């Protein structure tokens, strides 16, 4: 097992940032810690790194109890959101820094640096300074520097948070390919649901210092364990079980709070025995997808997402009368509002 967190808690004054967390991360996996601000994800990452010490519990890295080890003793690579590169050093010198501190032989340092420059697709830029690089390139240098010392665990704290959307998306795909090459046990913190789902092997959803659910992206999305997970992972309509849209459906609704994904709202132009009447109140064109805001006859607002092809079939317009039904939905006894 790469990382084991056993009943770990951490408190700052009266605020309990991490509350009795238990977590196992297999060696070689790429795992996302996902949650809103204040959920404890960054504190948990710092506890694994040794930058914070737990009040209770143990941290086990590659089979050894690391709870009382220093950061240096843990053999961890750490990448922050804002790069933390040395401005007065070239790209090559930044990558070599950790190896030189450890007094590695010069020929080994040179070979490792060139290998990493190629790995992070920065060959030819080794003599540039950080100020001469784009944000995406600087983050690649930070990752190369973290990998230079061949860490047993790589920790990334919102590594793409300071970048614009296009660069962030490109780097996500690149990080996934990089991980598939190096196979280092990697944990990264993010509040971006799409980022977590796209990049990771497993997602750890956190809320108020606790782990709500651990699973693959598909498991987290398709089988959420709690109303919080359902609400936090992707868009959702939250409706009472008494809503008109469920009255004629064949779905089994067990609890009073029903969660309906926009893509699971079926829109028809004519009524049948399982549909409810609704009015189109707003259309939002995103190019690849159309968002449709609907108002049911009972006043409930429901959002639907349509593919471009389905939208072209329906030819919807504002104020148009349509008929809707749920394709799938989940209900929970309690509703946690984010």
Curated annotation (Swiss-Prot):
ATP binds at residues 35-42. GO terms for cellular component: ATP-binding cassette (ABC) transporter complex. Residues 3-233 form the ABC transporter domain. It is found in: Cell inner membrane. GO terms for molecular function: ABC-type sulfate transporter activity; ABC-type thiosulfate transporter activity; ATP binding; ATP hydrolysis activity. Keywords: ATP-binding, Cell inner membrane, Cell membrane, Membrane, Nucleotide-binding, Sulfate transport, Translocase, Transport. It is a peripheral membrane protein. The keyword RNA-binding does not apply. SMART domains: AAA. PROSITE patterns: ABC_TRANSPORTER_1, ABC_TRANSPORTER_2, CYSA. Its main location: membrane. InterPro entries: AAA+_ATPase, ABC_SmlMolc_Importer, ABC_transporter-like_ATP-bd, ABC_transporter-like_CS, Mo/tungstate-bd_C_term_dom, P-loop_NTPase, Sulph_transpt1, Transp-assoc_OB_typ1. SUPFAM superfamilies: MOP-like, P-loop containing nucleoside triphosphate hydrolases. CDD domains: ABC_CysA_sulfate_importer. It catalyses: sulfate(out) + ATP + H2O = sulfate(in) + ADP + phosphate + H(+); thiosulfate(out) + ATP + H2O = thiosulfate(in) + ADP + phosphate + H(+). Its EC number is 7.3.2.3. The complex is composed of two ATP-binding proteins (CysA), two transmembrane proteins (CysT and CysW) and a solute-binding protein (CysP). Part of the ABC transporter complex CysAWTP involved in sulfate/thiosulfate import. Responsible for energy coupling to the transport system. Belongs to the ABC transporter superfamily. Sulfate/tungstate importer (TC 3.A.1.6) family. This is Sulfate/thiosulfate import ATP-binding protein CysA. It comes from Nostoc sp. (strain PCC 7120 / SAG 25.82 / UTEX 2576). The gene is cysA.
């Amino acid at each position: 097992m790469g990382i084991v967190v056993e009943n770990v808690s951490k408190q700052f004054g009266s605020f309990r940032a991490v509350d009795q967390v238990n977590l196992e991360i297999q060696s070689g996996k790429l795992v996302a810690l996902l949650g809103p601000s204040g959920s404890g994800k960054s504190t948990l990452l710092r506890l694994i790194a040794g930058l914070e010490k737990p009040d209770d519990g143990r941290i086990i890295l590659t089979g050894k109890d690391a709870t009382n080890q220093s950061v240096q003793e843990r053999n961890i690579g750490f990448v922050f959101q804002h790069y933390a590169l040395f401005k007065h050093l070239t790209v090559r010198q930044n990558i070599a820094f950790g190896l030189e501190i450890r007094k590695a032989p010069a020929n080994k340092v040179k070979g490792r640096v060139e290998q990493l420059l190629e790995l992070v697709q920065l060959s030819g830029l080794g003599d540039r300074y950080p100020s001469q690089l784009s944000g995406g390139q600087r983050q690649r240098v930070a990752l190369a520097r973290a990998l230079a010392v061949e860490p047993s665990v790589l920790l990334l704290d919102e590594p793409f948070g300071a970048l614009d959307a296009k660069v962030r998306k490109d780097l996500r795909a690149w990080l996934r390919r990089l991980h598939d090459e190096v196979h280092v046990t990697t944990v990264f913190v993010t509040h971006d649901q799409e980022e977590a789902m796209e990049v990771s092997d497993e997602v750890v959803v956190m809320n108020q210092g606790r782990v709500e659910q651990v699973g693959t992206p598909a498991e987290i999305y398709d089988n959420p364990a709690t109303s919080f997970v359902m609400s936090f992972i992707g868009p959702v309509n939250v409706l009472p079980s008494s809503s008109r849209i469920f009255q004629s459906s064949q779905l089994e609704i067990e609890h009073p709070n029903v969660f309906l994904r926009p893509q699971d709202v079926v829109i028809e132009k004519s009524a049948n025995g399982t549909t409810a009447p609704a009015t189109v109140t707003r259309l939002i064109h995103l190019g690849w997808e159309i968002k449709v805001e609907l108002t049911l006859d009972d006043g409930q607002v429901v959002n639907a997402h349509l593919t471009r092809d389905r939208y072209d079939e329906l030819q919807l317009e504002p104020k148009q009368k349509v008929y809707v039904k749920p394709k799938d939905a989940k209900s929970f006894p309690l509703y946690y509002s984010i």
